[in-house]
Amino acid sequence: MELLCCEGTRHAPRAGPDPRLLGDQRVLQSLLRLEERYVPRASYFQCVQKEIKPHMRKMLAYWMLEVCEEQRCEEDVFPLAMNYLDRYLSCVPTRKAQLQLLGTVCLLLASKLRETTPLTIEKLCIYTDQAVAPWQLREWEVLVLGKLKWDLAAVIAHDFLALILHRLSLPSDRQALVKKHAQTFLALCATDYTFAMYPPSMIATGSIGAAVLGLGACSMSADELTELLAGITGTEVDCLRACQEQIEAALRESLREAAQTAPSPVPKAPRGSSSQGPSQTSTPTDVTAIHL
């Protein structure tokens, strides 16, 4: 007897883009007014934290990103979790032994807000190799919520992507690819503390600019595109250009690190043999697939 499994990949129901909502200037202006509320005011490594260092934050961020990729989370779950992490660390001194616990709680909260089916406590504990117990997650969930004043609906860079792309009027066959590359840049920025105090709109605008120029998705020059993007979000041209250059530099550094740690190449399969490609996820394109 043969059994056939017809179960497909889990897909969350999605609403189609609303041109009136995307084109309404009040929506963009509302996000621009609110974004500063969710940006850390100063470097917490200098003012608040004594044990935690920038490289520890980066290691935690990469682990959190891997969890999101494994669980095929929505692309805005990881940046939102990093926003919670930075806001908490900017006001509460934390021991380095508690850092993974804090990151796990932030993932739990972000998935509850942005996922159709949130990550479970049990599953997150497995990802920590049982270093975090379920009761710790529950206790710290309440603690983090209190320190964030229950204000979880943070404005992040991902919220600006659709609004900016709608105003760029790119060719329809390039929009999806530009958005996917921009999402990769946003995930990369979230792992780097250098961008933690940048306004989300500037990070989103710089990521889209880097993606458009890297893909050659429009006929405008780099200066013309930068001026157009700066006008959309009301950003100073020089600041936006510096942010975009910093994003591209972070990408080059990430590619260099990936090349150093890359495994040896796998021999090609004999001709005629079939191999199953990786399934599509809702997480961004891998950073090694980006070309400037």
UniProtKB/Swiss-Prot annotation:
The keyword Nucleus applies. InterPro entries: Cyclin, Cyclin-like_dom, Cyclin-like_sf, Cyclin_C-dom, Cyclin_N, Cyclins_cyclin-box. Residues 272-285 have a biased composition (Low complexity). One of its GO terms (cellular component) is cytoplasm. PROSITE patterns: CYCLINS (PS00292). Keywords: Cell cycle, Cell division, Cyclin, Cytoplasm, Nucleus, Phosphoprotein, Transcription, Transcription regulation, Ubl conjugation. One of its GO terms (molecular function) is cyclin-dependent protein serine/threonine kinase activity. The modification Phosphothreonine is found at residue 283. Phosphorylation at Thr-283 by MAP kinases is required for ubiquitination and degradation by the DCX(AMBRA1) complex. Ubiquitinated by the DCX(AMBRA1) complex during the transition from G1 to S cell phase, leading to its degradation: ubiquitination is dependent on Thr-283 phosphorylation. The DCX(AMBRA1) complex represents the major regulator of CCND3 stability during the G1/S transition. Polyubiquitinated by the SCF(FBXL2) complex, leading to proteasomal degradation. GO terms for biological process: cell division; G1/S transition of mitotic cell cycle; negative regulation of transcription by RNA polymerase II; regulation of cell cycle; regulation of cell population proliferation; signal transduction; T cell proliferation. Its main location: nucleus. This is G1/S-specific cyclin-D3. It comes from Mus musculus.
